Amino acid sequence: PYPLEIKICLASWKRVLPDYTVRVWTYEDAKAIGCKYIDQALSVRKWAFAADVVRFYAVYKEGGVYMDSDIYLHKRFDRFIPETGCATFNERWEEGETESGIQAAFFIGSKGNDFCKEVFEYYQTRDFIRPDGSLDQTVSPYIMRSIAERRGYVCKEEEQHLKGIDVY
């Protein structure tokens, strides 16, 4: 059921990480979380916005690695796996921009980590469909950055070790 590009990426995971188990979160799994934001995003077929929330719930509740399915792995990332907390990476958001932010397509977290919990709790207090009918299409890297800034994150392309989150 996956496009060729995704099949190639998933095959790279199995090749590079043969000791890992891949967990695919389904529509039914997302609905079972019981989060209004997820349910509203799903109801209007905005899958990526529902997935933004599911990824933080998954890593908070189960621990592990979150990767978008279009990530191709060349080598292992063991050195970035935190004993506790969350690890993610800086990224430049727009070509030519000096502003950088936090990567949401690939991050690692211990079960119960405070950072993923706080991001998930942010979404639990929000509606995807606003009272006026418009959609809250704020992408998760902005939410991550806002929460990380409260922990001391500065938008610079440099390694930062903060309370509960390491940014590389």
Can you say where each PLM-predicted feature lies in the sequence?
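Glycosyltransferase-associated regions of secretory-pathway enzymes
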Residues: 1-51, 67-168
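Small-residue hinge/turn detector
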Residues: 52-64
